[in-house]
Amino acid sequence: INKADFVACHNPSYIMKGYKMVNDVKPGGKFLINCQWTPEELEKHLNAETKQYIAKNNIQLYTVNAIDIAAKIGLGKRTSTVLQSAFFALANVLPSEDAINYMKEKATMKFSKKGQDIVDMNHKAIDAGKDALVKIDVPAAWATAVDTAAPEASKGPAKLVKMVDEIMKPAGKMDGYSIPCSAFADHVDGTFEQGASAYEKRGVAVMVPTWNAETCAKCNKCAFVCPHATIRPFALTAEEAAAAPANTKKAPKPIVKTDYTYTLAISPMDCMGCGVCIGVCPTKSLTMVPREGEEDQQAVFDYCVAKVSEKPEVATDATVISSQYKQPLLEFSGSCAGCAETSYARLITQLFGDRMYISNATGCSSIWGGPAATSPYTVNKEGFGPAWANSLFEDNAEHGLGMYLGQRAIRERLINDVKTIAGSEKASDAVKAACEQYLNTLEDGKENAAATKALVAELEKIDCDCEARADILANKSYLSKKSVWIFGGDGWAYDIGFGGVD
């Protein structure tokens, strides 16, 4: 079906992002939007292209506030029953009265074992869906509507911005067919820039957490469980706190044994609204509120990410609390709201991400982990982050082992190069000292990373025809100790990939 008689948009963020959903409605068809907006507010959220299509094609436009209806009835975020009822009231696939009765009969059969209260709750949702529809009068002026605000230009590394603007943004607006083959010229080898997910800002959550700084225990459990790295603690110096946006919330007392101001920054436009952070908070300092009322907190989150430095004395691997001050190198993925996989993977990147290789089996973790042009794996301010690759479903163990053996072989050659330089009479004392420090820390990831940086700096200072030096500098990314991981689900681990047979 390329053109339908009825299309419904169940998430208002799709309207705000400008998805071309209404273009799939036949002329004279019906378009239903689930939202909390009044007709006047709706007009502000529809872009010019959507308005023009509705007006020029005589689309019948309706809204329904299934979000508030479901919450009021007691169904929480489960709007599907309300929206199913609205569908039958508008789509005319069955006489609407018959459809409503069938829905109620099915609800009674399905939920009777859970009690009459649950049955009644669903019956109320069914009635509410058909009764809460609002017909929107389409102004004639929509046919010539024009967008007044120009889209904001992307900022960041040139290659990343080019990929975001030419591939990610059109695809994200359901306009993938407009992308020319030339846009993929930089990616013919299958590699894509890291960190693109930070540009999506999808705003898909209707409800997001808001933080009460007065009652917060600074335990960081919320950040520890957040699957999407959208709630993060930051330690601010006096200067950073003073320069923060005026609406930045700050804990009344500094972080223990420091002078740093504590803040918990939340990204409402990246949050998925799962509520896992709410459940884990021991002091109930987080509550769910409508996202639109929290959108001013996005500036606070963006400031903290861009301008607040990581403090080594509080950002350590030692505890749950300290680990969450470290930058996650997996953020804003497309995994399901509340996904536990991404919580684990995100934590691993906080501990090892700047020197991490990942071999990923095909499955959920490859879908949220490696979507083309929207990678959620990112890099730190020095440009280091996880190197990620996906082979097949059945050979992930071999693929990961190959990664490990390959990088080890290159590193062992470089280690011999370092030994050659360290034993050379021509090497300066500074170069020899850097070589010795490197060789003494080979199996310590953190210490070796620092020693590698110092060694490369010393070798870059000198000018000689030494083959060992040239080999090291040409392959310096392999010099430090790496952390190799194999990610996969139970289908790979216990079924297809179990015997290692391709």
What are these regions (language model features)?
Residues I1-A171, A241-A246:
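Active-site cofactor/cluster-binding pocket
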Residues D5-V7, G29-L32, I59-Y62, S80, ...:
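Structural motif
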Residues P12-Y14, W37-P39, I67-I69, A107, ...:
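Acidic, glycine-rich active-site loops and adjacent beta-strand->loop/helix elements
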Residues I15-G18, L46-A48, D68-I69, G195-A196, ...:
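Glycine-rich, charged/polar anion/phosphate-binding loops
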Residues F87, H228, G497:
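Active-site-flanking alpha-helical
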Residues A99, S112-C271, I278-W485, G491-W492:
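Ferredoxin-type iron-sulfur electron-transfer modules and their immediate structural context
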Residues I496-D502:
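A short alpha/beta connector and helix-capping loop motif
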